[in-house]
Amino acid sequence: MVNVVLGSQWGDEGKGKLVDLLVGKYDIVARAAGGNNAGHTIVVKGVKYDFHMLPSGLVNPNCQNLIGNGVVMHVPSFFAELEQLEAKGLTDARERLFISSRAHLVFDFHQRTDKLREAELSGASTDGKNIGTTGKGIGPTYATKASRSGLRVHHLVNDEPGAWEEFETKYRRLVQTRQQRYGDFEYDADAELARYKKYREELKPFVVDSVVFMHNAIRDNKKILVEGANALMLDIDFGTYPYVTSSNTGIGGVCTGLGLPPRVIDEVYGVVKAYTTRVGEGPFPTEQLNESGEKLQNIGAEFGVTTGRKRRCGWLDLVVLKYSTLINGYTSLNITKLDVLDTFKEIPVGVSYTLRGKKLDLFPEDLNVLGKVDVEYVTLPGWEQDITKITEYEDLPENAKKYLKFIEDFVGVPIEWVGTGPARESMVYKQVSK
């Protein structure tokens, strides 16, 4: 059994909370894409665990965890995150953590060039705005991967004669390319190589052939949960390009990032915030640059885990969700942070876009078009009561249930879970038939 949790909007939907809820039922939790540019917090028995690169299944003592080939890995950050988790009580984490030998390495020079590249991309964009990178070196690493000049984990841990010398040569070539590209790019390559020579031995026990690992698990009928990073609207192909991340964050990235054929995937859970947020620049049709937007931001505590940046806030955009559903094929949805809407008398929901009076059939790929659309809203009545203590779906206010039913009917996918508050246990389960 392979089930997948994916973000359906622009990230920060609350995927970690659903994974936290589900992880006790699984034998393996795997990451398929991204790096340490995403983040979420899981609370277990009052202890907060911050995850960025490592799979959340580490909180389950019976769960193995895999960083897949589609992930790009900054080794110092990997060990720093692991040590923080160990310090908080996950003392056996190393025994249950594995890394694909095919995962690409993020070096410090990738992070250095990230900001330089950001400035160039902002100059090339249609509106002159920054892309909004986290500065973690993710984009430059995927660029070296695509140009077939990157270094993978197996290059680092290979102990065959001459392997380290080959690694060093390729590494220095990558640094030299950046020095030629950016002119005054000063960088201590010797120091980083010395660090990686040390990491080489430390990393070896974690490294596996992830294709063999995953397919052996499937053969043995293990229960596998794939933990998505970022979200569909940040996908390099299907997101609001170029205001996206550098990997495939949708269902396609799950297959390529773990070496899985599509037929082995059973359930795809789409996580949807009850309103919409995004971090950084890029079009955002339902954004509310007004009192409503500020209210959503303040009540929802909309600040990024990884960057601390304020999230832009707006109403739920069902055009985005329907588009996301077409691509990812969600079998059920988790609506999160419904309680943030508790005090709103009326709640507008975006249901269609028009351009110069003409209705668009689907979410547009052209940002020049997207930036000019008018959003048509349906305004639904609020419930104006506190739902944070509610534990049963039937006990939700009628208008809250109508809001959820409107979403289900619009996208044609059942809602299985509803987040009713920030607490770990504040999740209402709704029986669905599939």
Swiss-Prot record:
Record's catalysed reaction(s): IMP + L-aspartate + GTP = N(6)-(1,2-dicarboxyethyl)-AMP + GDP + phosphate + 2 H(+)
Catalytic residues (UniProt): D12 (proton acceptor), H40 (proton donor)
Cofactor binding mode and count: Binds 1 Mg(2+) ion per subunit.
A molecular function GO annotation: magnesium ion binding
Pathway: Purine metabolism; AMP biosynthesis via de novo pathway; AMP from IMP: step 1/2
Binding of GTP, residues: 11-17, 39-41, 311, 337-339, 419-421
Transmembrane segments: none
GO cellular component labels: cytoplasm
Subcellular location: Cytoplasm
Annotated positions binding substrate: V305, T306, T307, G308, R309, K310, R311
EC numbers on record: 6.3.4.4
Superkingdom as given in the UniProt entry: Eukaryota
Keyword rRNA-binding attributed: no
Cofactor(s) the protein needs: Mg(2+)
Keywords tagged on the record: Cytoplasm, GTP-binding, Ligase, Magnesium, Metal-binding, Nucleotide-binding, Purine biosynthesis
GO biological process, one term: IMP metabolic process
NCBIfam families: PRK01117.1, purA
Function: Plays an important role in the de novo pathway and in the salvage pathway of purine nucleotide biosynthesis. Catalyzes the first committed step in the biosynthesis of AMP from IMP.
Family of the protein in this entry: Belongs to the adenylosuccinate synthetase family.
Protein name (record): Adenylosuccinate synthetase
Organism whose genome encodes this protein: Lachancea thermotolerans (strain ATCC 56472 / CBS 6340 / NRRL Y-8284)
